[in-house]
Structures are given as C-alpha cells and as structure tokens.
Amino acid sequence: MPLSSQPSSSNLKRKQPTISSFFTKKPQLSQESISNDVLEKEERDEEREEVAKQEEGLRENGGTRSNNVDDDEDDVVAPASKRARTNGSHSQNTIETPKEKHVERPLPSDSIQKTELSKFASSPATEGETKERTKERERLHQKFVRRLGGPDCLIGIGRNTAPEAVPEEVGEGDEDDEPSPPPAAKGKATAKKGARKLTPMEKQVIDIKRKHMDTVLVVEVGYKFRFFGEDARTAAKELNIVCIPGKFRFDEHPSEAHLDRFASASIPVHRLHVHVKRLVSAGHKVGVVRQMETAALKAAGDNRNAPFGRKLTNLYTKGTYIDDMEGLEGSTASMSATGTSMATGYMLCITETNTKGWGNDEKVLVGIVAVQPATGDIVYDEFEDGFMRSEIETRLLHLAPCEVLIVGDLSKATEKLVQHLSGNKTNAFGDEIRVERAPKAKTAAAESHSHVSSFYAERMKKVNATNDVQASSLLQKVLNLSEQATICLSSMIKHMSEYGLEHVFQLTKYFQHFSSRSHMLLNANTLNSLEIYHNQTDHSTKGSLFWTLDRTQTRFGQRMLRKWVGRPLLNKLGLEERVDAVEELKNLERVALVEQMKCLLGRIKTDLEKSLIRVYYGKCTRPELLTLLQTLQMIAQEFAGVQSPADTGFSSPLISKAVASLPTILEDVVRFLDKINMHAAKNDDKYEFFRESEETDEITEHKLGIGAVEHDLEEHRSTAGEILGKRKVDYVTVAGIEYLIAVENKSPSIKKVPASWVKISGTKAVSRFHTPEVIRLLRQRDQHKEALAAGCDKAYATFLAEISASYQSFRDSVQSLATLDCLISLATIANQPGYVKPEYTNHTCIQVDQGRHPMVEQLLLDSYVPNDIDLDSDKTRALLVTGPNMGGKSSYVRQVALIAIMGQIGSYVPARSAKLGMLDAVFTRMGAFDNMLAGESTFMVELSETADILKQATPRSLVILDELGRGTSTHDGVAIAQAVLDYMIRSIRSLTLFITHYQHLSSMVHSFPDHELRNVHMRFTESGPTEEEITFLYEVREGVAHRSYGLNVARLANLPAPLIELAKQKSAELEQKIHRRRLAGLVRTVGDILADSAKADESLIERLISSAEQL
C-alpha cells in the first residue's frame, strides 16, 4: 500500500512513530497541556530536520544502514524517515552524530538488560565500526529505550492519538510514584538499589512534618488522603488499614538507606472526618494537609510545571475537634439508655506558683482557665491549695477536661495528680486525657497582660463606640483577671490560635468564675463517694445522680442539667423560683402547654448550641446551616403569638421569661432563610446555595462565563459537522468525559478526521475525538468553574460572618430552651410516686420523713426501706451510726446527702416530707485506699482528707465520716475518731454523720447533755442456734449495735467453712477475755469506791457507769 494513501482502520490503532519522535517532548496527561495543531506541525518539521542531519553525519562517517525493516505485521506503518525517503527527500538512510552534546541520564541497569537482545534490530552492527560510533549507538539506544519504555511498547501507538486528559488530581495521586533519577552509571554505587532523590511532593510533606513533629499528618493527594512514614504506621494501627512498607523516619537515617520510598497508607476523601475522629479519640493530634490549587487554575497559572501547592489547613485534637457531624444529631435517649460517660469537651490550662512552705506545709497558688470549644463556655479561677491538692482535684473532676495544657513547671504533687487522672482509661473521666505543655517565662505575668489587652483592644473600641455598659463591664472583668488566671488565658488564646478557634474568647458574656459562692461546694471526694456524675464500679453514668435526674430531650439541655447537678444553689429565692417552676410544670392544668413544649423539644434533632458555635467559627456546612435556621424558625414560630411573659400562660417567672425569649429571633432567622435556596442547601450545592437575587457579582460573572462557553460548544457542533461532511454532529459523554465527537470507523467520515483532532477513546466500531476548539473551550469552562467555586466559598464565609453578628441573641434563645428542657426533666422526676416538694429554710437543718436513696431505689428490684433523719444545728448536730457489716450504714448516710443535694438543685426529693436548710458544702471521707504515687499509706490518706474537711467545713456544712481510724491500731484509731468527732460537734458545729465499728465511742453521748450527739444503729434480727445468722432490716433506730457480725459477711463471701469455724472460735475466746478484763476493772472500781467512799469523785463514778455499760 502506498504510504501516501489513507491507512486502513486497523492501521489507525497501531502505528510506529519515528525514532526521532521518541526524543521529543511527550504530551502531558491533561487537557490543558495538549498542544494545538500549529505546534504539532512545527515539531514534525523539527523531527525531519534532525533525522536529515543524522543521516548526513552517517554518510560522512562511511557508515551504511540496511534498508530492510523488520515489519512482520502489515498494520504497522513505516517510520517517518522511510516516508520521507519515499517522497524523494533523501536517497540513503544514514545517521549523523549530532554536533550538540546532550547531557543524558543513564538508564537503570534492569531497563538495559530488558532491551539488550532487541536493540538496533533493523541495523546489525558492522565489524569495523569505531569506538566513537559505538558510543553514539549506545547513547541513541538509551534515548530510544527511555522514551519508548521497552521493546513491546510500540503496540497500540496510533496516529495523532493521546491519552484522555484526566484531571491533574489523578496524576497527583501518583506523584510519589513518578520516575525518579536513576542511580549513577554502571559500577558506581549500584548496590544501593532503590536509593533515589525525593519527589517534590515528598519534599513538601517533609517540610510540613518538620514544623509539626507531634502531629499525625493526613495529606491530600489527588482523590485520596495519604499518611507517610511513621504517621502511616500510626494510622494503620488505629484505623485498621494497610500500611505499605517503606521508610518510617523523616531524617534520612542510614538504617533506611536501602528503601526507595516512604511507608504509606491511604483513605478515601469522603471518609476523612470519620478517620480523623478515630485518631483524635485515640489521643493523637491530627493535621490535615490540603492541595491549595485546582487542576484548571493551576494549568492556567505561571506554576503549571510545579507540584501542587499544599498547606496545613486544619489541626485537630480531642478538645478542638468540632467538625464532628455525628455529635450534632440525635437525642439524649440513646446515651442515657446505655449509661455511657458523657465527655464535657473542656480544654483546661493550668499554671501554679509556690507561695510558701514545703512538704506537708506546702502552699501553691494555682490558676486555671477552661474552655469548651464546642459550646463557647469559659471557666476561670485562681486559688490556693495545700499539699493534698484537693482543690485542683475538685476542679478537674467537675470540669472533666479531655485536654490539659500545662504552662511552665508544676510541683511534684500536682504533676503526679494530673498524670494519675490523665494516664489511664479507668479514671473518673472514663477516658484518657491528652496533656500538652507550654513554656513559662520569668516575665510571663507582664507579657500575658499585654497579650490579652492587645487581643481585646479591637473589641474594646467597638464597645466604647456603642456605649454598651453591660458588654463594657464584662470585658473589663476579663481584663482585670488575677495574675495566674491571666497567664492561663493568654496561653489558651495562643494555643487555640493554632487550631483557628481563638475567637471563642471574644465571647466575654460566657466567662464564669468556678468558685462562685452562689453554689454548694462539692469537692472531688464528694463527687466520687456520692456518685454524682459516675458510678464507682465502671465509671459510667448509669447509677449516678445525674443519670437518675436526666430526662432531657436535647444535648444542650443535658449539658445544662449536668451543670445544675454539680452546682446546687445557695440562694433561697432562686431555689424556690426553680422548684415552683417544676411544680407548675407537673400541674394538671398545664398539661397541654407542657405537652406542646415536649413535642417541640422532641422535634429538635440537632445540637443547636454546637451548630451555633460552628457558625461563629465559620466551619458550619451548608446542610447543617439550613437545619439550624429551620430549627430556630420552628422554635420561634411555635410561640409566635407570645409578645410578653404575661402571654405565655405560665405564672412561674422562670418559665414565662424563657418562653417569651424564643420568638424574638424569628425576624433575623427569616431574613437569613430568605437568602438561601432550600433545595440546593439541603443537597450541599454551593453553586446554587444563594437565591439568584442574593448572588454576588463574582458568582454571576463566572456563571455567565460558563454559559457562554457552553453556548460556544453548542455552536461548534455545526463547524465539526462541516469538517466530517455532516450537517451537525452530536456530542457524547463516555466514562465522565464530555463533548466527545464519535465517528464510525467504517464510515467515510473517518477519512476526513483532521490530524489536529485528538483521539480520546474508541472501540472496534467507533472512534471518539476532541477537536482543538473543544479542548480550548473546556479549558476555559474549567477555569470558570474553579473560580466560581472559590467565589461561592467566599460568599458563604461572608454569610456566616453576617449570621455570627446575631450569635448572642440566638445563643440566649437556645439557653432558654435548655432551661425549659431541664425543668421538664425535673418535673418528670417529680411525677414519680413517692417524691415530694421540699420546704426550704435559712436555718441549717435536714429533716426528712421516710427518705429513700434515689439511685438504689431505681436499680433495686425490691422495694427500698425508707428511713428518717433529723439534724438541726441548734439541737442534734451529729449522729453516731453503728451496725453490722452490710447493714446499710453507708447507704443511709449517702441517702441523706443526696436528698440535700437534690433539694438544692431544685428537684423534688424521694421522701414523704422534707425540710431542708441551705447547706454551703457537703464533705465526705469514705472508703479505704492508699496513694502510692504520693507515697501515702491508707491511714495517711484518711487523716489528710479529714484535715482538709476540718479546715473547710463551716456550721452550714454537712460532713460524712465513714469508719475514721480503721487504718491503724484499735487504740490509736479510737482516740483519733473520738477527738475528731468531738471537735466537729463542739468547735465547727457542722451537721455530722459519723459511721464507726468502735462501740466504745457510743459513750460520748454522755459528754453532750443537750443531745448534740445521738447514737443510732441499723436494725437486724439474730437467728440460728448460735445467733450468728442475722437478717438485715435496714431500719435506723436509736441505740448502739455492740457487735459487727463480720463472720456473717465471711459466710456470704463463701469463705471455707473450716476457716469460718476457726474464726468463730477465736472470736469467742477474744470476746470472753475482754469481757473478763472489763469485769475485773469494774470490780476494782467498785472496791475503790467501797474502800473510801469519801474520796469517790465524779470521774470515778463515770468510769463505773462506763464499765457497766460495756458489759
């Protein structure tokens, strides 16, 4: 077949280019990089000139080349040089050595070996060729192999065809697999197989990693996110994904010199936040590195040949991860049902300074600032703490932080406490705490004050300009924080700036002091002993007081109730206002209104508080924003007819004020919703998110540009049809590739396809092309699309900032709704049988008739035995509680404390009647455990905690002491217990419940003639031949239990029978011995009195009475 004729369709599929074409630049795998037809023509001309020069050079060297071509397959087209010779341009095929010396990279040895047998197949070497010609042959051969890739790659190369111009992100996905510079020439360190230079993308990753060595980096590479090096190993372990082996270190360590790439692991783009959440939950700090350029805009820019620009865009830890969409939806029912521990999400900053003393006399001044990024709440405090660090522990247990930032060095005692609470998953928080550290300069106080002042300077200007007195006072309060608190605040602002969340500190309205004396103090021991937030078995919420009272329907309501439980009120008026609101909500006359509110709360499926703060941060997604605004609109419209508190239908000021605040946001919400295209927002369509009238000029411009390009593409159909001899062609879309022109291979039109058309794909029947005009227009359209996406994101960010201006009014409405949720929850508890409204008094007393333990009652299948309590600061201030082991002593004293706490929360209490005074604190000393980290024994812990109670307790406190003195010998234990009890009653005068097995202490009642101390015991009945088998009655009665019946507990614990019998025998012997000794002492006392009755004083008589009672 003549070379000038049209090739067959089969020849179109497989054609062999010229050798010189392998030395020219390859077309890139993107639409933007495909050359136009003019450039292609120039390149072909250059190829012909180069071949001609080479042939002339060969003739001069005397070399000849065989004209025989190995062309076994008839569908392979002859090379360009042969076509040129046929046309009469040259008579011989000779190759000239080029004059310009090109610096070529040597090929890998394996590539040379693969093609050794097939090189120069069509021109066998001449015997007399010179060394220079041999070198030239080898150089050309290496060029040929490098460009072609191997002897079999000629198959499938067609005329003017190019691979589909896939988006550059796909290429970026394999950036680390790009061919790297091969090793040096043969014989030079070829043993280091795989050693190579770093790719541009790997250099980017290393540069970012060196700045964030403590961070697990997730790098966007095309359509995947990838982990490299040690981060890949971490991700594989935590996420259970595959880690491809390679280098783990980022410092080019010699031990990994034999490896040619980094270890890697990958995750899909759409699963990014799922895996990030799992990593931060495991305690890791995670950074997301994103591509900052798009394919279309990059191709049009000046850096088209450089790698994609990448930047660390997000940093996450457990406390700063606010992009969790799962936590925004759903009610509290599932959490309450499982009893799982609810993390508060606080990040706490702590610093301390030693003020005086050392050892047991040590005093430290501590400052804390805690922020909850998910809600915007901020807590601060400065306080002095003793060597037991009970104050720090109290705040840590109340706040339950998930992260702790330590500024400067802590003392050993504080360091041990923080490490103990954060270092294991079985602590009171139920999870590990992430601990970070920040340096503290000697001039930290001055620097921190300057930093905080400059941070709030802009806000101060705005406040002064608007003459907002309330905002000004709040801001002034923040600026006047104590020295230690200011250091913490400054450190937290810097720390949160790293995560882009520092704006949370601009919300000065939500700063709260921790140690406000408007709340009852519940320290760490009390929280644990009374199981306020977590049970002591598995540290879950099930079985805790919070679990008992939690009937909330929303997440933000649940968080508010948690604060109420941990901070019972001291203000009698505020307390009565809250309990009156609960009473009204359970009133049958308000059933319809209460059901309306319950129904409204039940329809709220999102965490409004978290969504609002995400809007404030500018991180809210479009569907989430639509849900937020629609939910706020639903809430406001539910009470749209309420103009004032008097219109609500409730008489309680607390309820009516909360309801009246809800419709005030309706106008702003509707104004924002009117700007949104609901359908597009629901589908997260950024291009149509705004209504047409609300679109910015930039968005409109690029939309018009896209429309113009698509119009030109439509017009181009006629032009393409004329070329193919048709009236008009139709575009087809295959595998996501648009605007393809399909031409049947057997039709006459295939012969009319210009060489400038790029073949994209095809089958046996059809070939599909892109014309140069289509390629140009698609490039324009992609640029417009990328610019449109950037414009839409910019307009959305501006819209979020506009909504943020109404943040405080929206937040206040959500807080009002949370208050209603909490009150309805307490009303639900109050509707349970056996609950009563407590009566409050300013006099310190606890008078409860038929009281019950609120948690045990719900967990027990059997009915709970109720008991009375009557403590009064002017009458009986203390009860000495005795009774057998497992007789219910601890449950009884816990019941008293829990009823007092519930009453001051504003809840109904489980009793027939209750009169409660305003207690300022509840202190407990229960259980026996040592503190190995501090080197303290069980008895040392007992006495240290008791000492703290004696220092902090007031006449308005309730103190519970359980078996004080059991950690040492009987004589010392009795002496200490007696001294402490006496001091509590006479000096401190607080309400006291004292549990003991020391029956000798019962004689103390004679020291208090006004009955400040009473003896009570837990009733039981004896049975069996030896009266060792007892039945617990769990009733509290006057008197003393003279035996503890420990052998009965041993029997219940299934100790071996012989062991119990031996213990019983020894117990009887010891009891008889003590009985005889007491009897002998009584006889001696009587003898002394009878011998000299005149000298018998009052103390001798008291000793006689005491000895008689002990018998």
Swiss-Prot record:
Region feature (Mispair-binding domain): 192-319
Family under the similarity heading: Belongs to the DNA mismatch repair MutS family. MSH3 subfamily.
Subunit note: Heterodimer consisting of msh2-msh3 (MutS beta). Forms a ternary complex with MutL alpha (mlh1-pms1).
Protein name: DNA mismatch repair protein msh3
SMART domains, per database record: MUTSac, MUTSd
Chief place of localization: nucleus
Swiss-Prot/TrEMBL keywords: ATP-binding, DNA damage, DNA repair, DNA-binding, Nucleotide-binding, Nucleus
Biased composition (Basic and acidic residues): 50-59, 97-107, 128-141
GO biological process: mismatch repair; mitotic recombination
Lineage of source species: Eukaryota, Fungi, Dikarya, Ascomycota, Pezizomycotina
Native organism: Aspergillus oryzae (strain ATCC 42149 / RIB 40)
UniProt GO cellular component terms: nucleus
GO molecular function, one term: ATP-dependent DNA damage sensor activity
Keyword Cytoplasm: no
Function, as annotated: Component of the post-replicative DNA mismatch repair system (MMR). Heterodimerizes with msh2 to form MutS beta, which binds to DNA mismatches thereby initiating DNA repair. Msh3 provides substrate-binding and substrate specificity to the complex. When bound, the MutS beta heterodimer bends the DNA helix and shields approximately 20 base pairs. Acts mainly to repair insertion-deletion loops (IDLs) from 2 to 13 nucleotides in size, but can also repair base-base and single insertion-deletion mismatches that occur during replication.
Source taxon at top rank: Eukaryota
